[in-house]
């Protein structure tokens, strides 16, 4: 009986590995039609008796403001161009901080956030974190940095039912994602840690302060010229 169970488990693991690899490869070229986070938000709205309409319009890389690209990197993952999906020093610092009893602090890279938002459910279990690590590794292996950031910008949550840069730009500022200014981009990046609680178009004092910090970080990174560092040559 035990050998049979082991064989079935092995087959299930092989099937999962193969199917997840195929899915990641497909999304290397094909825009994801939606994300696990979008499904989760839709289900939550039904359960709460407050159904929402999801706003999301996919925009290719060239139709998204370079200011927003740099703002998101400045605010969320300044080592994005150089790491392979995991920022080990940041993870170690977050673990040490959490062990000291502070508020739980994350250290997710943009790649990890793409893996989580695209494929997984919310939660902090080790099982989910293991799946996140698996998808993060696959994404870094098969996608270019430009593709990772493109999918992130088209999948990130920027308000109740608002997903992606185009929907966010229209919802908060009444412009297309390609026409976002540096200040608008910084305000959008500033609310990413808590996009339901905070508003990019009506920033609190904290969000305004964080947006100012992000603008300074953008300048230190070199502004839009920083995007030239996103290496596409190391990808398969």
Curated annotation (Swiss-Prot):
<dbReference type="InterPro" id="IPR001264">
    <property type="entry name" value="Glyco_trans_51"/>
</dbReference>
<dbReference type="GO" id="GO:0009252">
    <property type="term" value="P:peptidoglycan biosynthetic process"/>
</dbReference>
<keyword id="KW-0472">Membrane</keyword>
<dbReference type="InterPro" id="IPR036950">
    <property type="entry name" value="PBP_transglycosylase"/>
</dbReference>
<comment type="similarity">
    <text>Belongs to the glycosyltransferase 51 family.</text>
</comment>
<keyword id="KW-0808">Transferase</keyword>
<dbReference type="GO" id="GO:0008955">
    <property type="term" value="F:peptidoglycan glycosyltransferase activity"/>
</dbReference>
<keyword id="KW-0961">Cell wall biogenesis/degradation</keyword>
<dbReference type="GO" id="GO:0008360">
    <property type="term" value="P:regulation of cell shape"/>
</dbReference>
<keyword id="KW-1133">Transmembrane helix</keyword>
<keyword id="KW-0997">Cell inner membrane</keyword>
<keyword id="KW-0573">Peptidoglycan synthesis</keyword>
<dbReference type="GO" id="GO:0009274">
    <property type="term" value="C:peptidoglycan-based cell wall"/>
</dbReference>
<dbReference type="Pfam" id="PF00912">
    <property type="entry name" value="Transgly"/>
</dbReference>
<dbReference type="GO" id="GO:0071555">
    <property type="term" value="P:cell wall organization"/>
</dbReference>
<protein>
    <recommendedName>
        <fullName>Biosynthetic peptidoglycan transglycosylase</fullName>
        <ecNumber>2.4.99.28</ecNumber>
    </recommendedName>
</protein>
<comment type="pathway">
    <text>Cell wall biogenesis; peptidoglycan biosynthesis.</text>
</comment>
<keyword id="KW-0133">Cell shape</keyword>
<keyword id="KW-1003">Cell membrane</keyword>
<comment type="function">
    <text>Peptidoglycan polymerase that catalyzes glycan chain elongation from lipid-linked precursors.</text>
</comment>
<feature type="transmembrane region" description="Helical">
    <location>
        <begin position="12"/>
        <end position="31"/>
    </location>
</feature>
<dbReference type="InterPro" id="IPR011812">
    <property type="entry name" value="Pep_trsgly"/>
</dbReference>
<dbReference type="InterPro" id="IPR023346">
    <property type="entry name" value="Lysozyme-like_dom_sf"/>
</dbReference>
<keyword id="KW-0812">Transmembrane</keyword>
<dbReference type="GO" id="GO:0016763">
    <property type="term" value="F:pentosyltransferase activity"/>
</dbReference>
<dbReference type="GO" id="GO:0005886">
    <property type="term" value="C:plasma membrane"/>
</dbReference>
<keyword id="KW-0328">Glycosyltransferase</keyword>
